[in-house]
């Protein structure tokens, strides 16, 4: 599918334009400069035409820190990979030296360019800045207001025309594709190695990796085909403790996006920093994924930094069973994302967890196993479980009819254990139980 890259200096409204084009708020928008760091991608559907759109970090002529410099390098690298560039400028505040600097860089890419003059609400300001806009050398701009949605359809039509003139196909069966994609999010504390793992699986630098916790702010996704199977991998911002997050801060927005990514996933990979071990925040993250009915995989990363790891592996397994006992049905994977070790095992675990999430068992098998369970371990006094059946998938959900007595939590856990050990293991998938009175 063709890819369109949004490029411009900081704070010209690239992320607002991106969100308007894809039809929902995916890129974080804030008045501060340099909010977008990674390349955030989405899909634009316009009647029967579809294409990918990528929001990039603002390019500074003289970056002030290492993160902004790496963001600039990532954007420059993508200039030659895209099929079309949207060069976004600010019609409200006029053309600056940074715009001319960026125009020279874009020209060197020899790519097709559409000049987009954003913040064009004021006709007077547009007219005042028109001579400088044409000096950029990219011909007639399209004047838009991403904030108000002005001329967005005109911009999309221009994009479609340019892409089709290059012989690129914009036709795709979105319904068929969406049904076959496994959606996987990487969740964890800041600096657990999520972005390194994301880049290692993609086999290219797609998101920034630095030793500084919290480098990733947006949730960044990429569609990948591995062994004929499609995966949508999502790298998320590290989830910070609530007590450390100002409700008005960018970290708050990042936390919200990360939780939203969990909700939109089939499989959640909970990435643990092997050096620090499982923390209370990791437990909280696991609880969020379980409560939302997502398949989970627990992965210890950075094992390359653990001396004599093979002799300490059992310690990590014990730590998993002790601190993440409530998702002990999850596959446990050991990784070195930076060295690309353990990634094949991770992909296999994702496949197995996805299968479990969608698996259905026969009603006869459920009742046979539950009757045997009750014969060996009778329910609490006064409680009768009459029969049960699986009523849903994603997650596997079972409905049991009872005589109306409340089923205590310990006995619910016993039912789940019986299902896993005697019917189907549902590796990686939580089992939800419902109870209904039938007199």
Curated annotation (Swiss-Prot):
The UniProt record gives the binding positions of GTP 2 as: 188-195, 235-239, 301-304
What the entry lists under Pfam families is as follows: KH_dom-like (PF14714), MMR_HSR1 (PF01926)
Would you kindly state one Gene Ontology biological process term found in this protein's UniProt entry?
ribosome biogenesis
Q: Which residues bind GTP 1?
A: 8-15, 55-59, 118-121
**Does the entry feature the keyword Nucleotide-binding, yes or no?**
yes
Record InterPro entries: G_ENGA, GTP-bd, GTPase_Der, KH_dom-like, KH_dom-like_a/b, P-loop_NTPase, Small_GTP-bd
Q: Which residues form the EngA-type G domain?
A: 2-167, 182-358
Q: Where is the KH-like domain?
A: 359-439
* Keyword line: GTP-binding, Nucleotide-binding, Repeat, Ribosome biogenesis
The family this protein is said to belong to: Belongs to the TRAFAC class TrmE-Era-EngA-EngB-Septin-like GTPase superfamily. EngA (Der) GTPase family.
Quaternary structure annotation from Swiss-Prot or TrEMBL = Associates with the 50S ribosomal subunit.
| NCBIfam families xref list | GTPase_EngA, small_GTP
Q: What does this protein do?
A: GTPase that plays an essential role in the late steps of ribosome biogenesis.
Please report the name of this protein according to its UniProt entry. GTPase Der
Native organism is Thermosipho africanus (strain TCF52B)
